[in-house]
């Protein structure tokens, strides 16, 4: 089907340069869309629907569940196990076959359960479209399915409606729209119909409304300019569909480790097969069983399950700290994060507009307090003595004006938490008046002019203690034009525009937004109030400077992140000056300069890559800008975390290595696209999550260092046995018992290790740094060889004493499990003495020790388990022998740690 071009980007005939619909007059837009105020005819609408397609977002069919499950068998180490299972089946060793196949299925199930269904986030966007729309067709009002809307339709909007398509407004009646899902800014937007100038970001296109946003007050009429995939919401949907999530550092490292193990296994098996055929007269069945045992021994089958256990414990810990992890590997990725890109409103700030400064004709004041709680004093600027508000003063008159000319109310819930009803600006003024504790007066509202986006002020006629007064609050530039006088301590004096403009500029540099107030006396006989009544006689009183203040805990959290080598970047839809001011208060490193979305729009990829590193404040940004910034940082080798709450943030969250959604004000779309959800919308939670992520990575590394020597020792034992012509020391099922049962159980103890003291004072690990670094390889080789040599000596001591192969294998099993247990304690620290680290405080170690002892008693002494695993009951003295060997190994490893500590620190 041929699609109509997006009308927002077409050029009317005769224009010499493309003009966007927000830059055109209402008549020009109607002409461009070939529409009229009376609406389209049914025939014209049907033709356009056939040409443009339905007003719906395209759906992409996801992979079926069974195919996603099978994808988890696509791993080189799983191939080794499947081949081993096939060979044991051919040889008739059905117990071995079933156990090996069971291991592969368990690993696949774990991976399948972890896998997130990314299509949910796209479905969430589709669910944001309204179901019906009121339109003007055939000269009359009709209600039609939203899917049937076409460019050129005239749509009627009312309070509470969800906007069904992108529209250019042709008529407004104090229309206010909530656009936070697209812009990220929580304040409602007052809409107009006038044409606008310039290449404006979405948040400044105040003569348009966008699909998925909500009408919060009054109503209006608009002409549809884009539907379906051509809308701003559709554009976000397309970006989401085109993003492929990066693999986490942990998964990349595990892939590399798996391929390295596979290469070693293959080389060893081929070499041993050739050697045994050429130099040893070993029956083919026994040789194949030995090689299968070698393959099973070398594969760390329990590692995926163990990693999942450790990550799951991290998830539970983070949940208690108000961070919900949606995808397990995110826990580890948090520890590798090098950059956090954060939204401003509500995440770094309190999302509670607060008055911080007062400007009057005589002086300026600063105001305490950072929330809606009416606690805080007023100070004369430069003084530490609080001001007592005296009746009849300029300050008292100004405070009384902002209190009475106000539609908001201060509220307190059953928990004692303070809030407001009404808009945030009026709420901030109401809170300030409450802080001042003004003496009670008898006030009665006589008439009111509600706030209107066209006039940019509201006004009331009040009777206050028997006097009539007109009060007005609004935009300073508008009220300036109405005033010829200003109130000072000497009474009414001529208005001094230069003074007010200079003071406003000074406070604007601090990121404050301005609201002005004025008043004039009125007649007690007056019962109405209109705009003409405000054109003369107003006396200017003063200006409130307000801001959404930083969260106190966010300041500490940013400092903690920067100490940990994580750079914090603020990406916001707010104005640059406000963003820089908040950035300086928060302590963001480079907050003296800001990059705007307009500047980003005109950068090529090379310039953007440089700007992404150089700047820490990005203002007036769009979804595309956020997405490009994340990609640019990733191309520079950064591991990027990105916060967001609106639909506009979803593409960047999905692209980021760690997408972080807000749980309170975040949309469902954003939460589905994210890897982590903050239940308190607090940046400080990110810092604590980074600490937990680093702890988890440390414990994962300890676990891998714990598991690998056992696999190496098992493999070396089998190789030595083949070379020496001895019995197979370990059968595949015994190897799987150690790799899946005992290793997993003991690893659980390491999962409970607390974070090391310097965990947030070290830089993030380098991108691409492998978990198996040089010292890790040395430790695995040293410990694995030591265990193998000890087991070989033990086997050589047992063999001449006439014991059965099953008895010898049982003693070797117990010796290897004991070695695992003592080495698990060694692994608590890579260089410190393990018994000096609060062994009694880690209850997990004692729990797994008890479970391990029970498991070994069952496999050695229960007849059913003896027949399944080929074990025999052991006399008590052999438990003592294996324990002595284990203690000796523990001491050797502790000595090795002491000797190599100096080399590790200088490496």
Segments predicted by a language model, with ranges:
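Generic alpha-helical transmembrane segments
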Residues: 742, 787-788, 810-824
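Membrane-water interface at loop-to-transmembrane-helix junctions
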Residues: 766-785, 805-811
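A C-terminal functional module that forms or caps the active site or interfaces directly
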Residues: 827
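Conserved cytosolic headpiece of P-type ATPases
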Residues: 1-761, 771-772, 785, 796, ...
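Loop-to-helix transition at the N-terminal end of transmembrane alpha-helices
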Residues: 734-738, 806-815
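C-terminal substrate-binding/catalytic lobe of Rossmann-fold NAD(P)-dependent dehydrogenases
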Residues: 794-797, 801, 805, 817
């Amino acid at each position: 089907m041929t699609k109509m071009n997006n009308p927002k980007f077409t050029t009317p005939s005769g224009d010499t340069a493309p003009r966007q619909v927000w830059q055109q007059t209402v008549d020009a837009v109607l002409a461009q869309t070939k529409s009229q105020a009376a609406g389209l005819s049914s025939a014209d609408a049907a033709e356009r629907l056939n040409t443009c397609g339905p007003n719906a977002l395209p759906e992409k069919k996801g992979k079926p569940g069974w195919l996603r499950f099978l994808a988890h068998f696509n791993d080189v180490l799983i191939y080794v196990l499947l081949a081993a299972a096939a060979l044991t089946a051919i040889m008739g060793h059905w117990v071995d076959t079933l156990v090996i196949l069971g291991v592969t299925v368990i690993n696949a199930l774990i991976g399948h359960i972890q896998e997130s269904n990314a299509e949910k986030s796209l479905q969430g966007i589709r669910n944001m479209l309204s179901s019906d729309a009121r339109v003007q067709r055939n000269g009359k009002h009709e209600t039609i399915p939203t899917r049937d809307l076409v460019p050129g339709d005239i749509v009627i909007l009312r309070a509470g409606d969800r906007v069904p398509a992108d529209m250019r407004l042709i008529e407004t009646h104090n229309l206010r729209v909530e656009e936070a899902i697209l812009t990220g800014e929580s304040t409602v937007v007052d809409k107009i119909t006038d044409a606008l100038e310039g290449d404006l970001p979405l948040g400044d296109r105040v003569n348009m409304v966008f699909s998925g946003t909500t009408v919060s007050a009054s109503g209006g009429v608009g002409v549809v300019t884009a539907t379906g995939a051509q809308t701003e919401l559709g554009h976000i949907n397309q970006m989401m569909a085109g993003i492929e999530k990066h693999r986490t550092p942990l998964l990349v490292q595990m892939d590399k480790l798996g391929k390295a193990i596979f290469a070693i296994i293959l080389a060893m098996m081929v070499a041993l097969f050739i050697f045994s055929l050429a130099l040893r007269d070993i029956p083919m069945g026994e040789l194949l069983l030995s090689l299968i045992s070698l393959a099973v021994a070398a594969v760390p089958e329990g590692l995926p399950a163990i990693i999942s256990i450790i990550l799951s414990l991290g998830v539970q810990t983070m949940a208690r700290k108000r961070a919900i992890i949606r995808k397990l590997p995110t826990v580890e990725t948090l520890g590798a994060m090098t950059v956090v890109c954060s939204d401003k409103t509500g995440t770094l700030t309190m999302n509670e507009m607060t008055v911080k400064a007062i400007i009057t004709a005589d002086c300026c004041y600063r105001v305490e307090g950072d929330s809606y709680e009416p606690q805080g004093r007023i100070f004369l600027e430069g003084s530490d003595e609080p001001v007592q508000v005296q009746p009849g003063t300029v300050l008292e008159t100004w405070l009384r004006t902002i209190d009475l000319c106000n539609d908001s109310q201060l509220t307190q819930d059953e928990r004692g938490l303070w809030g407001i009803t009404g808009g945030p600006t009026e709420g901030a003024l109401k809170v300030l008046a409450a802080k001042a504790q003004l003496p009670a007066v008898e006030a009665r509202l006589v008439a009111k002019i509600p706030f209107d986006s066209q006039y940019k002020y509201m006004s009331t006629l009040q009777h206050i203690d028997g006097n009539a007064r007109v009060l007005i609050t609004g935009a300073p530039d508008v009220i300036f034009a109405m005033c010829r006088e200003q109130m000072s301590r000497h009474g009414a004096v001529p208005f001094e525009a230069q003074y007010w403009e200079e003071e406003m500029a000074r406070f604007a540099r601090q990121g404050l937004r301005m609201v002005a107030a004025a008043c004039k006396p009125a007649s007690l006989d007056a019962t109405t109030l209109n705009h003409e009544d405000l054109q003369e006689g107003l006396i200017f009183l003063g200006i409130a400077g307000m801001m959404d203040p930083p969260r106190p805990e966010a300041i500490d959290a940013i400092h903690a992140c920067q100490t940990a080598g994580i750079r914090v970047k603020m990406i916001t839809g707010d104005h640059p000056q406000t963003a820089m001011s908040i950035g300086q208060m928060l302590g963001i490193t480079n907050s003296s300069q800001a990059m705007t979305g307009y500047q980003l729009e005109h950068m090529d990829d090379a310039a953007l890559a440089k700007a992404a590193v150089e700047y820490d404040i990005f203002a007036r940004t769009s979804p595309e800008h956020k997405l490009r910034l994340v990609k640019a940082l990733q191309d520079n080798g950064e591991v990027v975390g990105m916060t967001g709450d609106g639909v506009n943030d979803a593409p960047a969250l999905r692209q980021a290595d760690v997408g972080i959604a807000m749980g309170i004000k975040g949309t469902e779309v954003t939460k589905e696209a994210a890897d982590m959800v903050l239940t308190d919308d607090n940046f400080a939670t990110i810092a604590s999550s980074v600490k937990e992520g680093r702890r988890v990575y440390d414990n994962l590394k300890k676990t891998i260092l714990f598991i690998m020597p056992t696999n190496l020792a098992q493999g070396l034992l089998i190789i030595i046995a083949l070379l020496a012509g001895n019995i197979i020391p370990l059968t595949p099922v015994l190897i799987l018992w150690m790799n899946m049962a005992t290793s997993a159980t003991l690893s659980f103890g390491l999962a409970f290790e607390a974070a090391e003291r310097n965990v947030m004072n070290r830089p993030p690990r380098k991108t691409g740094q492998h978990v198996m670094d040089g010292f890790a390889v040395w430790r695995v080789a040293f410990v694995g060889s030591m265990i193998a040599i000890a087991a070989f000596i033990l086997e050589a001591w047992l063999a001449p004493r006439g014991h059965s192969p099953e008895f010898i294998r049982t003693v070797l099993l117990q010796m290897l499990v004991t070695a695992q247990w003592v080495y698990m304690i060694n692994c608590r620290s890579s260089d410190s003495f393990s018994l000096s680290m609060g062994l009694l405080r880690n209850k997990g170690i004692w729990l797994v020790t008890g479970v391990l002892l029970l498991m070994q008693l069952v496999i050695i002494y229960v007849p059913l388990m003896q027949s399944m695993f080929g074990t025999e009951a052991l006399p008590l003295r052999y438990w003592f022998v294996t324990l002595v060997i284990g203690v000796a190994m523990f001491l050797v490893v502790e000595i090795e740690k002491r000797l190599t500590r100096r080399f590790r620190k200088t490496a």
